[in-house]
A protein has these predicted regions:
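Sec/Tat signal peptide C-region and signal peptidase I cleavage site
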Residues: 19-23
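Metal-dependent amide/peptide-bond hydrolase catalytic core
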Residues: 255-444
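Positively charged n-region of N-terminal signal peptides that target proteins for export
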Residues: 1-6
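Acidic/His- and Gly-rich active-site-bordering loop/insert found
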Residues: 24-141, 150-167
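Histidine/acidic-residue-rich, glycine-tolerant segments that coordinate divalent metal ions
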Residues: 91-92, 128-140, 146-147, 158-281, ...
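Divalent metal-coordination and catalytic microenvironments
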Residues: 46, 94, 106, 145, ...
């Protein structure tokens, strides 16, 4: 009798699936279209009113208010920066409980960049604000965090509307200071996994101009790199520019160090292991005819594996110190190397979570619009949510932003003064993908 009933149930389910389930219940994508108009206006507001890392109070206040209106239990502000960062953290945590089941954390970041927008959009940013040095700078959303915040809210609204389709808990995170690598750790330091439910999964999206609007990219395993910011002070002995023999020139020494650093990856790292060392800034001297006492270098170092990361940093220190010694720099004037400026750990997308999610996304968006992509040497502190003792599986998908048919070689990239997403298509796809992902993880 049990076999018979099971057979009937299976037949009934097959019949429903074959003859009208989707007709009775609109797809997530169709439902997302209904929210796109209101979300578009919100996106334009966020884009036109960007705020730098540590100063996201207006963005987070708006997000908190909108999440509260959607029925979430909102706590704001949340976050605790380290003692040396003397700023209030404006993080947002919003919870929607809907019976028994898993907990899914959905994160979006909110901060912008100190850049002058040149897109010419009618809603382009003309914002200016003081940065952490006190200097007033132009501010722009050049990394898509305005889109991340908009999509986060759209998915939150959708999940509230679709409570009859899922069971469990949704934790929405509005995160600060991603561009400085400290926002995720600030939330965790303030008890994110103690004061609120520990997630069984954590998911996020990041805009990607290498993909067209309407497309989603995914990368199982290592997806984004360790990011180390290193400051080096090359110290010499200052003198008159007409009498260089009376000093030790830190400008020439810096040039030698920079050239030598080009061998760190090519001669110290296994060729099949990714690694990047870039000198992004060099500053020294005040006048044509003065050999300065010191020159300052700023480096960024990228890797995936911890063993490679350590070898890169050790090689930088060895080359820098010994190049100075070879130039006759005395022991008390050897270079000062600060490797703890900023660090963001590599992001590892849980392969099982990725595989599970990708099938759902292909069903919702079409197989041709869900594309496996290569790992990136960019960095993202979303990785921090999976690095605690709870070992939460995480997945950050990539959200296409480029106009259909545009040339990938000439599209403005992230952190470009010309970058902007195609708004409607990006919003709809982002909300669809995130909502479908969470529904799949919490499906009744």
């Amino acid at each position: 009798m049990r076999v018979f009933k099971t057979g009937l149930l299976a037949f009934a389910l097959l019949a429903i699936s074959s003859f009208g389930l989707h007709a009775a219940q609109p797809s997530v994508q169709k439902m997302a279209e209904k929210h796109t108009g209101s979300l578009l206006e919100l996106y334009k507001h966020f884009h036109a009113n960007p705020e730098l890392s540590y100063f996201e109070q207006n963005t987070s206040a708006r997000l908190a208010d909108e999440l509260s209106k959607a029925g979430y239990e909102v706590t704001y502000p949340v976050g605790k920066y380290p003692a040396h960062i003397d700023y209030k953290c404006w993080g947002v945590v919003a919870v929607l409980k809907n019976g028994d089941g898993p907990t899914v954390l959905v994160r979006g970041d909110m901060d912008a960049l100190p850049m002058t927008e040149k897109t010419g959009l009618p809603y382009a940013s003309s914002a200016r604000m003081a940065d952490i040095s006190g200097e007033t700078v132009d501010v722009m959303h050049a990394c898509g965090h305005d889109m991340h915040t908009t999509v986060l809210l759209g998915a939150a609204r959708m999940l509230a509307d679709l409570k009859n389709q899922w069971s469990g808990t949704v934790v929405i995170i509005g995160q600060t200071a991603e561009e400085r690598g400290g926002g995720a750790t600030a939330l965790l330091a303030d008890g994110l996994y103690e004061r609120w439910p520990v997630p069984d999964y954590a998911v996020a999206e990041h805009t990607d101009p290498s993909l067209e609007a309407g497309q989603i990219g995914y990368c199982p395993g290592w997806a984004m790199a360790n990011v180390d910011m290193i400051d080096i002070t090359i110290r010499g002995v200052g003198s008159h520019g007409a009498r260089p023999h009376q000093g030790i020139d830190p400008v020439v020494l810096s040039a030698q160090v920079i050239n030598a650093l080009q061998t760190v990856v090519s001669r110290n790292i296994n060729p099949i292991e990714p690694g990047v060392v870039t000198v992004g800034s060099i500053h020294g001297g005040t006048k044509h005819n003065i050999i300065p006492d010191e020159v300052k270098l700023q480096l960024t170092v990228r890797s995936y594996k911890e063993t490679v990361r350590k070898k890169l940093i050790d090689s930088i220190e060895r080359i820098t110190i010994n190049t100075a010694r070879a130039a006759g720099v005395p022991q008390d004037r050897l270079p000062v190397i600060n490797g703890g400026v900023e660090y963001t750990p590599a992001l590892y997308n849980n392969p099982e979570l990725v595989a599970n999610t990708v099938e759902v996304l292909k069903s919702e968006l079409g197989e041709q619009n869900v594309i496996e992509i290569m790992p990136s040497t960019g960095g993202e502190d979303f990785s921090e949510y999976g690095r605690t003792t709870h070992k939460v599986p995480i997945f950050m998908m990539r959200l296409g932003t480029a106009p259909a048919g545009s040339d990938p070689e000439t599209r403005p990239g992230l952190h470009s003064t010309l970058f902007y997403p195609v708004p409607e298509a990006t919003i709809k796809t982002g909300v669809t993908a995130m909502t479908a992902t969470v529904l799949n993880l919490l499906r009744k």
